[in-house]
From Swiss-Prot:
Protein name: Stomatin
Topology term for the membrane: Peripheral membrane protein; Lipid-anchor
Parts of the chain in the membrane but not crossing it: 32-52
Lipidated residue numbers (S-palmitoyl cysteine): C30, C87
Tissue expression per record: Expressed in all sensory neurons of the dorsal root ganglia. In the CNS, expressed in many neurons of the spinal cord, medulla and pons. Expressed only in scattered neurons in the cortex, hippocampus, thalamus and basal ganglia. In the cerebellum, expressed in all Purkinje cells (at protein level). Widely expressed with high levels in heart, liver, skeletal muscle and testis and low levels in lung, brain and spleen.
Protein family membership: Belongs to the band 7/mec-2 family.
Gene of this entry: Stom
Swiss-Prot/TrEMBL keywords: Cell membrane, Cytoplasm, Cytoplasmic vesicle, Cytoskeleton, Lipoprotein, Membrane, Palmitate, Phosphoprotein
Lineage of origin: Eukaryota, Metazoa, Chordata, Craniata, Vertebrata
BP GO annotations: positive regulation by host of viral genome replication; positive regulation of protein targeting to membrane; positive regulation of viral process; regulation of monoatomic ion transmembrane transport
Subunit structure: Interacts with LANCL1. Interacts with SLC2A1. Interacts with SLC4A1; this interaction positively regulates SLC4A1 activity. Identified in large complexes with SLC40A1, SLC14A1, SLC29A1 and AQP1. Homodimer and higher order homooligomers. The homodimer is banana-shaped. Interacts with ASIC1, ASIC2 and ASIC3. Interacts with STOML1; may redistribute STOM from the plasma membrane to late endosomes.
Outcome of mutating L109D: Does not abolish interaction with ASIC3, but abolishes regulation of ASIC3 channel activity
GO annotations of cellular component type: cytoplasm; cytoskeleton; cytosol; endoplasmic reticulum; melanosome; membrane raft; mitochondrion; perinuclear region of cytoplasm
Phenotypic consequence of V197P: Abolishes homodimerization and oligomerization. Abolishes regulation of ASIC2 and ASIC3 channel activity
Organism per entry: Mus musculus (Mouse)
Length: 284
């Protein structure tokens, strides 16, 4: 964790190579003349010029100040109150808060030749405002486009079953890939999530039919096991009753009681127990 924080701090302090070279060069005679003229203009137009020269940078912002096209020494500045010269100075504000955007649905051909539609969401923030301004024209647009291509490339190497079961692993791989790719832009990709995986209608029907067939097969197996267990129990009960005349008599009386309680209109002709024992003995 400390290594990540240290690398994050180092990345936030990086400055472009071109800025390092330019910072060593002087403004030149013409440059200093223009700067002096700007100071003179501020003085003669004071206090009106104060409204033009004073800029406020909020807590979640950083500002890059250019003087005659060169980034001022120190790179990004803020938050606080800053003074700029008219005509020679310009500034760009960069929002340092976390930004989220949706990856539009992407048509992806999986490794097992199944076409699916996948979308997601990415969370990122600008970690180095100087790199985000100096190294790329539009860091937000570039990150969005790179997220789309990364999503297609990551899912194109996976089977459908892997995509459906390993979403978190795929999202983590995408986050790592995006973070490395946007490092030179001063962007820190914090999180990537896969929102939805849409399958073709025919494939959905086939998977539903397969699942239904599997459920029916399991139900049949359970029913068959129940019948087999019931048959074993009946066989064991018949053997016990055959060996014990008293048990047969009790079962006989219990059956008569049940019939009399449920169907009062039924006429029962009881048979002698000895006859029943003879019948069961002959069958056995």
């Amino acid at each position: 964790m400390s290594d990540k924080r240290q690398s994050s701090h180092v990345q936030s302090q990086r400055i472009p190579e071109s800025f390092r070279e330019n910072s060593k060069t002087e403004l030149g005679a013409c440059g200093w003349i223009l700067v002096a003229a700007s100071f003179f203009f501020v003085i003669i137009t004071f206090p009106i010029s104060i409204w033009i020269c004073i800029k406020i940078v909020k807590e979640y912002e950083r500002v890059i100040i250019f003087r005659l096209g060169r980034i001022l020494q120190g790179g990004a500045k803020g938050p606080g109150l800053f003074f700029i010269l008219p005509c020679t100075d310009s500034l760009i504000k960069v929002d340092m808060r976390t930004i989220s955007f949706d990856i539009p649905p992407q048509e992806v051909l999986t490794k097992d030749s199944v076409t699916i539609s996948v979308d997601g969401v990415v969370y990122y923030r600008v970690q180095n405002a100087t790199l985000a301004v100096a190294n790329i024209t539009n860091a937000d647009s570039a990150t969005r486009l790179l997220a789309q291509t990364t999503l297609r490339n990551a899912l194109g190497t996976k089977n459908l079953s892997q995509i459906l079961s390993d979403r978190e692993e795929i999202a983590h791989h995408m986050q790592s890939t995006l973070d490395d790719a946007t490092d030179d832009w001063g962007i820190k990709v914090e999180r990537v999530e896969i929102k939805d995986v849409k399958l073709p209608v025919q494939l959905q029907r086939a998977m539903a039919a397969e699942a239904e067939a599997a459920r029916e097969a399991r139900a049949k197996v359970i029913a068959a096991e129940g019948e087999m267990n019931a048959s074993r129990a009946l066989k064991e009960a018949s053997m016990v009753i055959t060996e014990s005349p008293a048990a047969l008599q009790l079962r006989y009386l219990q059956t008569l009681t049940t019939i009399a309680a449920e169907k009062n209109s039924t006429i029962v002709f009881p048979l002698p127990v000895d006859m029943l024992q003879g019948i069961m003995g002959s069958n056995h």
